């Protein structure tokens, strides 16, 4: 075994992980189940970040069936990766409940506290005692990047973001279930919150990602697309036109067909 070659290979692997979200996820979690779905989503997010950092203010609407890993990629790994590359930026993460948003917060912190992450991005850390002596918030609602301006805040959709500026805004499942999704009152309330609260907190060179299970054409995703033609839509059915499962390693075709038959 050539130790120098092994060290070189490891450094190359680390450098690739710093440049690619998909490779970053695999470096942090070698057991992560990769798929064409995960590759496509990560490639779109890599491009999204390029557009965001060049001032294009991108909007990405991502639709995928439940339990296929979209939240893992966008709400857990992406914020950690983003802070690694841009430790002075600010992330706002919203979901249908503050408890769920808090769980996402905890998962992001766990990733950023791992040895693997610290090797890739040593400048982006969550230490409670930074070298400059300034206290750093770290709880289930908010945390900061030590010795940098970066902050992560989370809240439930409909809740306040008063005083919080956001560069990368992530809305992950703004509606809890189909009953709420079909309610005109709920849809109106979410739209009003999006327009009057979420949008007003975005910075000049921001980017926003909206993920949701689609139950209605006039939901948040649909209205954003209607009002903002530049928004890009990335939609994945559980079973494609060729009759193949989206991620068979997670949900095989026979299971999806059973579910489809039950739902009608």
Identify the function of each model-found stretch.
Residues 1-58:
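N-terminal accessory segments
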Residues 59-61, 90-92, 151, 168, ...:
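Residue-level preference for the first positions of well-ordered beta-strands
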Residues 137-197:
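Conserved RecA-like ASCE ATPase "motif II neighborhood" in helicase/translocase motors
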